[in-house]
Amino acid sequence: ARLSRKAGNQRRGIAGYMDTSYYNRFGGEELMRRLASETLLAQGPMGSVLLSECGAADIPPAFWNLAEPQTVSRIHRLYAAAGAQVLITNTFQASGHALDQDEIAPSMAEVNRGAVDDARQANPQLLLGSMGPIAIEWFVEDSLEYREIRANAREQASALLNAGVDGLLVETVTSIRNLQPVLAGAHDAADGMPVLVSFAIDDKGDLLGDGLNIEGAILYAEKHGANSVGVNCCSLTAATAAVPRMVATATTPVTVRPNAGNPVQTQDGLVWREDPEAFARACVEWKRAGAAMVGSCCGTTAVTTAALADALDI
């Protein structure tokens, strides 16, 4: 792993002093440089692939980071072999609150560091630390609940950055209320490291939770420090329609990672209808419209990643 150490480098965060000596400054700079100059290919999902493993339907994805690290690393290696330049840690639901809800015993820091170590086994060009929404209701900013979400996000962000990720990815954001304390917590820990934000939208381009259009969501995220904005876990149609709208609005690099559509319940569990060729055709449009990073989300596999790599001529 590429680690940039600055002796005694500390900053005062909302919870006091944090040691940022192990933050991967060079990796963060490279991530932003390449987002500004290339169309990068990100890996596909971790959760839906892990859930499809034999007998794993009821096992929280974060559990695998320490219990079966070789399985997590194998999935990352498949994506890297398919052409993914950006890997994403298996930490979407690995905040302290989420781990408590899933009754996962190891500490939040151990689970997140394990996920980074698992991904590093695939020798990624770039590595993003995934952060998902935190399921705590809050009503007033600076309330006890708001501060709890912010603290959870800050602690997870710090764990990921200290483990050596090149940047943070706050993804599948369904509302501004969903985003606000998580983004604040991520920035509490980031100390200048990149924080990317990705929204979940419907086919009209509106956020799934509060109905805000993608333009408004982008303006909010950028105003509050997002270094990149995008969409994920939406339909292919929604993603393709959203890219030019996002590029026209954003002042930061735009990302796009749709899913494979709605799964179908079968005797063997949930099954997605993966269509790599459709993703490859759409990818040409995303790149032409100005997307800085493309990829795929729930229901896809390394087969779709390979099709996207072919479309990008990687």
Where do the protein language model's features map onto the residues?
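Domain-level signal for soluble alpha/beta catalytic cores
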Residues: 16-314
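N-terminal amphipathic/basic-hydrophobic helices that include classical n-h-c signal peptides
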Residues: 1-22
